[in-house]
Regions:
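A short, conserved structural fragment
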Residues: 184-203
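Short alpha-helical segments that sit at the start of domains
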Residues: 123-160
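Short terminal targeting/anchoring segments
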Residues: 45-81
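Short helix-coil junctions and helix-kink-helix linkers
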Residues: 165-181
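Long, low-complexity intrinsically disordered regions enriched in small/polar
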Residues: 1-50
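Short, amphipathic alpha-helical interaction segments positioned at domain boundaries
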Residues: 207-364
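Long, low-complexity, charged/polar intrinsically disordered regions in eukaryotic proteins
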Residues: 83-138
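Short acidic alpha-helical/loop segments enriched in Asp/Glu that coordinate divalent cations
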Residues: 160-169, 199-208
Length: 369
């Protein structure tokens, strides 16, 4: 009977398994997370010499404190999930990886992954994927992480306005600045680390120019010629005087909705028109939702009258935003990278890297819709 009661206590508690040492916790407070991380790693530290042990303990303390600081900021309501054995094992793997490397980048990436890990449901594919990412990240050099980020960026589609797209491209500055250090060995190693699969002789991705011309068919165009622009503005009772644009008041009151849709265009002082949206699908979807399908031919005429960029002009568009794009585009157009397809763990690690470095959330789910 006594044995059954003891078993009952264990079943109702948290079991920590660390190198054969079993510990039971019947409750968890937020400050206990540091002690949990230390405990699940403790038995592994025995392999270090006295001098190395001191450094290992310092790194473990730093990692634990930094983890709790970020947890408190981002997911303070989920701290008690550290009572779950699977999450403790993930924390153990992440902490040990940093103890071994002591690399600042490793710590940032691993803590970011643990924050994601705390937020997902157990026994899901996403949970398994994050656990795998925690094991894979310590194997990757900073150059490999940057390469994954670049490949993910190439595969993303941005929908919005011209200025926001420029801002989005510019936010890659820190990554493309380091692009020259990425080597063929980094590309090959991603296959060994199960982040990508390479199929030599088969192109899995379009070249940079072709992809952007196809995906963003409005941004990469020259302005609409003056005569076509003038006819368009005349139809919508617009006039331009010394760089100032005005609408006929009566026309505005009668056709307010169509006037609002003109925000998809940029009207220049020289009398030409450019497109303010990234692509024609977004433009036409907006017209349809506003009940303005009758005006679609007018916008189609603008598009047909404007000349598409050539490949050199597409490249120059990026380089004018940041000169480091020159090397990054050359890198991504290598045959060895065009034959690469991201595996889920590589896609996920690259997505988290982009989210962290760009300062905006890049949803992983968009790749699997």
């Amino acid at each position: 009977m006594g044995d059954k009661q003891e078993i009952s206590k264990i079943l109702d508690s948290t079991v920590l398994q660390a190198g054969g040492d079993l510990t039971i916790n019947t409750g968890l407070r937020a400050p206990d997370v540091i002690e949990i991380v230390k405990e699940v790693v403790a038995s592994e530290l025995a392999v270090y010499t006295r001098e190395a042990d001191k450094k290992a303990v310092e790194r473990l303390q730093r990692f634990s404190e930094d983890l709790v600081e970020v947890l408190a900021k981002k997911v303070s309501d989920k701290l008690n999930r550290f009572n779950k054995p699977a999450l403790q094992i993930a924390a153990r793997d992440a902490a040990l990886s940093f103890v071994r490397s002591g690399d600042d980048l490793d710590e940032k990436v691993l803590i970011d992954l643990l924050i994601e890990r705390v937020s997902v449901e157990e026994h899901t594919t996403m949970q398994r994927l994050i656990d795998q990412a925690i094991r894979v990240v310590p194997m990757l050099s900073p150059a490999c992480l940057d390469l994954l980020s670049l490949v993910v960026f190439r595969n993303l589609s941005y929908i919005g306005t011209r200025d926001k797209m420029v801002e989005w491209i510019r936010s890659m500055g820190a990554i493309i600045q380091r692009a020259p250090r990425i080597s063929n060995l980094d590309i090959a190693f991603l296959s060994q680390a199960d982040c990508v699969v390479s199929v030599p002789g088969i192109t899995m991705s379009s070249r940079w120019c072709d992809y952007f011309l196809d995906r963003y068919d409005l941004i990469f165009r020259h302005p609409v010629p003056c005569d076509v622009s003038a006819s368009f503005m005349e139809k919508f009772s617009m006039n331009c005087d010394n760089g100032s644009f005005a609408f006929d008041k009566a026309y505005w009151e009668k056709n307010g909705t169509i006037i609002e849709s003109l925000s998809a265009l940029l009207f220049h002082f020289d009398g030409t028109i450019s497109f303010n949206l990234t692509d024609s699908k977004t433009l036409y979807d907006g017209l349809q939702k506003a009940g303005l399908d009758d005006f679609k031919p007018d916008f189609e005429l603008l598009i047909e009258s404007s000349q598409r960029f050539n490949c050199d002009e597409v490249r120059r568009f990026f380089v004018d935003i940041d000169p480091n794009w020159e090397h990054a585009i050359t890198l991504l157009d290598k045959d060895s990278l065009l034959s690469v397809q991201l595996l889920p763990v590589g896609q996920y690690i690259g997505t988290r890297q982009l989210s962290r470095l760009m300062g905006r959330e890049v949803p992983f789910g968009v790749f699997y819709q």
